[in-house]
Each structure stands twice: as C-alpha cells, then as structure tokens.
Amino acid sequence: MFACDAVDLDFLSTAPTRLGATVKVGRPPSEVFAAFAHDPANWGEFFPGFDRTGCYDTPGPHGVGSRCTKRVTGIKVEETVLAWDEGARFAFRVDGTTAPAFHAWVEDYHFEPDGSDGTLLRVAIGSKPRLAFKLAAPVLPRGLAFVLSRAGRSLEHGRWFSTPTSNQRHLGQIAPW
C-alpha cells in the first residue's frame, strides 16, 4: 500500500493540481447524496472503472471520520470521510492506494437544488500527483467532466438506488448482487 498525506479540506485551495466540474442530475439532492455517500458499493454502478466491492470499514452510523475502501480499475483505494452534511455535502481524502498515483488526494462534492426537483452537483478535486499521474494531467479536466456527466445520467436512470445502510461487508467478501 502506498500511503498518502493526511491532508484536510484546506488542501483543495493549495493542491498542486486542482480540478472542478459541475453537472445537473435529474434527481433530488437527497437521492444523489445517498448514492455517493451511503454505500461505497454504489460507485460501481455509476462511475466507470469502479467495481461494486466498495464498503465502509468502520461501523455506522457513517459520517466525518468514517473509513471506506473502494476499487477502481483493480486498484484498492482507502479513504476517510472529511465532510458529511446529509443531502448537501460529502468529501473525503485518500489515505492510501495499491498503486503509486499520488501523494495526496481530496474530493469534495456539493449537492444543491437546481430549482426543478433536480440537483446541481459540483465536485472539486485537489491532488499532489506522482510522476505517472502527472503525465495524465492534460486529459484530466475533460476526463472528469465526462465521468461526472456519465455518473449523472446513470443516477437519473436509477442505476444505483439503495437506502441508507450500514454496509459492513469485509474486504474481500463478494457482494450478494
């Protein structure tokens, strides 16, 4: 495991690499927030590259300080929740990965009503990349916009829906679906 720096939300304003994107999602903020925060396995439904083995490693109820593990393109990613404002904000930092992609990483999601029963989803990402990730820098802004738009469409079509859960599967346990 490659450890990452234990940064906080302030890192978003000082990170060497900063990305941002906004997408409209035709679901209420409470539902979009639930898709992102309540069950890490959901990410496999709406983000390309993620599988459905994501799980919280800490007991519920989940919130600031909760830890989870996800897998993206076969890489294990361990995270700590930095912000949890039900229906409005969800943020986390990466604590470690099985690939040396970056020294630090923070993601911050804001879920705002769009005035028509939908959500304006804003994401900010701050990172301190290692060499391999630096090489991908030119495509990251368009890649983030594409991935977030695709996630929004998947959410609109209900490809994730779960209810708040205390997802306590252990790492390596296969999800029942």
Where are these regions (language model features)?
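Hydrophobic ligand-binding cavity/cleft-lining segments
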Residues: 1-58, 176-177
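A conserved amphipathic terminal alpha-helix motif
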Residues: 2, 126-177
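Beta-strand/loop substructures that line and gate deep hydrophobic ligand-binding cavities in soluble
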Residues: 13, 96-149
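Generic structural detector for well-ordered beta-strands
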Residues: 22-26, 80, 110-112
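Glycine-rich portal/gate segments that line the openings of hydrophobic small-molecule binding cavities
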Residues: 24, 54-100, 120, 153-162, ...
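Short acidic, gly/pro-rich beta-turn/loop elements at beta-sheet edges
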Residues: 31-33, 78-80, 102, 131-133
